[in-house]
Amino acid sequence: MSAIRITGLAGAYGLAMILGALGFQYLGGVLPCEMCHWQRWPHIAAAVVGLGGLLLVSAGIVDRKYIPALAWCALILIAISGAIGAYQAGVEWKFFPGPASCTGPRFVFSGMADLSHVHNVVRCDEASWRLFGISLAGYNALCSLGAAALGGFALIRGKS
């Protein structure tokens, strides 16, 4: 497969993942935790690098020789999101601790002053949605790491 197709597919993948996450959030009512937001940024960047890069190449602003670099950048960004998803899935399964900002102890009321600091925090160590025992973070890990590996393999194979 050509580098230009891989670049476009990587950008489209990033965009699709963001749209899917937003769909789960706004249509499905699955609120994201802090680590969920961490996973979104690399997908946004992959969409910008992949699709934006192709737009700049097609407009003649960027030379075509940079297409493989754009593809690699987008694939690395997708892999980063997948790695964060794998980390979050591990936190959900209690394999290792997550960040204190979203896995700390539940709120304990000890007086009226505590109510001024209450926030609706979505915990990172509890999956809000699962399908076949796998959370959204787990699916992001599986799909994104798999897509990045396939894209990288196709780029390497395309050079020979």
Locations of regions flagged by a protein language model:
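Structural signal for the C-terminal ends of transmembrane alpha-helices
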Residues: 51-61, 152-159
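Loop-to-helix transition at the N-terminal end of transmembrane alpha-helices
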Residues: 30-45
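Extracytosolic (periplasmic/ER-lumenal) interhelical loops and adjacent juxtamembrane/interface segments
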Residues: 93-137
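C-terminal TM-helix exit segments that contain a strictly Trp-centered aromatic cap at the helix terminus
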Residues: 16-25, 79-95
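Interfacial segments of alpha-helical transmembrane regions
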Residues: 1-12, 62-82, 148-149
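N-terminal cysteine/histidine-rich coordination modules
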Residues: 7-8, 17-29, 39, 57-58
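Alpha-helical transmembrane segments of multipass membrane proteins
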Residues: 19-23, 51, 127, 152
